[in-house]
């Protein structure tokens, strides 16, 4: 996993502490788009561009929000190739029909946009990236911030009414999103990229302890924060939809398959079958990326055949309607 140091690309490995625990670096770009005009970035249809990977759960959050809010015409999108090699994310539409080119600066690699935004940038080159076409700058590269902006700030240009952050539930949404981040969203990476047995064991214990907790929680209500789909569910969904196809095998998160959790599994099916969400899920990109982009985890790049999943299968969550 490379990174940029003072604007220069380095392929040096990073990510673990001295005890073998995977450490995720904080994102750097944190500006906000405000509907009230109180920031340097006002809401304007056509001004902003979203860079994503269809494989990445963090980027997937933002693509779902864009779809649920009907922002396809207001915010354009580019998709990187699923393979993340030594040069990290790359634009290669010639090699994959679901990948695109870069319309902003004609970049071959995503890191070129980071260098354009900050010639002295030091940090990881990650998706999602919310780009301002007008100034040629990165507005934000934190998935939770972008999800929140798409949820709350773009009402004037949205074509669908879908409140992912209802005022009455905001404190609970924030609490739940915080609660699932370390053990589940980042927990699968803590397990998969652990450099010691102790670090792996700790991550797996945290992960499945949290899954057990939310399995019980979802036995009494349809969604994480009650009866409506919110940002917290989007953050949970993008991890769960990758669990059996990838994390269970590739990241050795295999105490149980998600399919063995009846409430979590049916909850996953329920969200997947929500209008406009299924089309944001690309299992080919997901499996190809993980199995072929992490040589320290899977040196031969062999893509596992299973587990087979049917996300269109009937679910039982209507019992809470």
Which sequence ranges carry the predicted segments?
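C-terminal alpha-helical interaction module
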Residues: 1-321
């Amino acid at each position: 996993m490379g990174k940029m140091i003072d604007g220069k690309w380095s392929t040096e490995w990073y990510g673990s502490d001295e005890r073998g625990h995977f450490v995720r670096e904080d994102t750097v770009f944190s500006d906000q788009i405000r509907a009230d005009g109180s920031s340097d970035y006002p809401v304007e249809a056509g001004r902003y561009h979203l860079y994503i990977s269809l494989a990445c759960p963090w980027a997937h959050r933002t693509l779902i929000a864009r779809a649920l809010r009907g922002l396809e015409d207001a915010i354009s999108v580019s998709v990187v190739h699923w393979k993340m090699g030594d040069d990290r994310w790359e634009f290669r539409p010639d090699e994959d029909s679901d990948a695109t080119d870069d319309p902003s600066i004609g970049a071959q690699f995503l890191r070129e946009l980071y260098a354009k935004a900050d010639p002295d940038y030091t940090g990881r080159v990650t998706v999602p990236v919310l780009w301002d076409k007008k100034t040629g700058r990165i507005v934000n590269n934190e998935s939770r911030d972008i999800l929140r902006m798409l949820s709350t700030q773009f009402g004037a240009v949205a074509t669908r009414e879908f409140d992912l952050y209802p005022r009455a539930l905001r404190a609970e949404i924030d609490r739940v999103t915080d609660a699932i981040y370390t053990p589940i969203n980042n927990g699968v990476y803590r397990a998969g990229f652990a450099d010691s047995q102790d670090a792996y064991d700790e991550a797996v214990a945290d992960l499945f302890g949290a899954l057990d907790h939310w399995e019980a929680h979802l036995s009494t209500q349809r969604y994480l924060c009650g009866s409506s789909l919110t940002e917290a569910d989007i953050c949970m969904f993008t991890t769960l939809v990758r669990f059996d196809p990838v994390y269970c095998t590739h990241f050795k998160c295999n105490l149980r398959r998600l399919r063995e959790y009846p409430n979590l599994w049916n909850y996953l099916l329920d969200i997947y079958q929500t209008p406009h969400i299924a089309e944001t899920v690309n299992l080919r990109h997901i499996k190809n990326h993980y199995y072929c982009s992490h040589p320290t985890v899977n040196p031969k790049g062999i893509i596992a055949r299973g587990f087979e999943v049917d996300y269109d299968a009937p679910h039982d969550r209507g019992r809470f309607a």
